[in-house]
């Protein structure tokens, strides 16, 4: 799906790549749309597990955020078509896209609430934490260009990580 995009991926292509008969496809999915609707949420859960495992090694909010940020980009190296799947989903699998956004939003909200409860960040209301959540989510999307500028799938440059972390540290610690 990631190679060709949602529009150009057929059931024939999917089954050929998976090495299964088309009938087998229908044992697992009701339709082409069904697989489109399941793809992003499943991949999103894998991404959150990967990022969470990376972030869990940190002791503070800022350490966990840096490790999670780096973990997100290491996930992209494993799944280079993730951004294409994510960016095409609003048009081809809008329910899946909304489910994915909600899953990521809830994860970040939990992370930020816990940090606020532990005194690591101050001065943010619940509504403001939601804004922060979307800012952090968007940063990953747009800073991804530094890992794939020339169409390759590179590591995120360290200076980008440092700039991101500086913004997060100064933005969240002052309140």
Labelled PLM ranges:
Residues 13, 34, 38, 67, ...:
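Alpha-helical elements of Rossmann-like donor-binding domains used by nucleotide-donor carbohydrate transfer enzymes
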Residues 3-7, 58, 79, 118:
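Short coil/turn segments at alpha/beta junctions that flank glycine-rich nucleotide-binding fingerprints
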Residues 45-48, 75, 94-120, 129-137, ...:
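Amphipathic alpha-helical packing segments from all-alpha helical-bundle domains
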Residues 38, 49-78, 132-136:
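Hydrophobic alpha-helical connector segments
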Residues 29, 88-92:
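Short helix-capping/turn signature of helix-turn-helix
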């Amino acid at each position: 799906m990631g190679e060709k995009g949602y529009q150009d991926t057929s059931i024939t292509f999917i089954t050929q790549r998976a090495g299964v008969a088309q009938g087998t496809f229908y044992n697992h999915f009701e339709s082409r749309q069904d697989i489109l609707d399941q793809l992003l949420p499943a991949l999103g859960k894998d991404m959150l597990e990967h990022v969470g495992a990376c972030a869990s090694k940190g002791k503070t909010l800022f350490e966990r955020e840096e490790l999670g940020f780096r973990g997100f980009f290491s996930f992209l190296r494993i799944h280079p078509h993730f951004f294409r799947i994510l960016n095409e989903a609003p048009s081809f699998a809008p329910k899946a896209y909304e489910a994915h956004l909600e899953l990521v939003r809830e994860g970040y909200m939990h992370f930020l609430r816990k940090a606020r409860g532990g005194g690591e960040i101050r001065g943010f209301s619940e509504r403001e934490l939601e804004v922060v959540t979307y800012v952090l989510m968007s940063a990953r999307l747009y800073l991804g260009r530094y890992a794939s500028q020339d169409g390759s799938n590179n590591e995120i440059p360290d200076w980008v990580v440092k700039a991101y972390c500086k913004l997060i540290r100064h933005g969240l610690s002052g309140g």
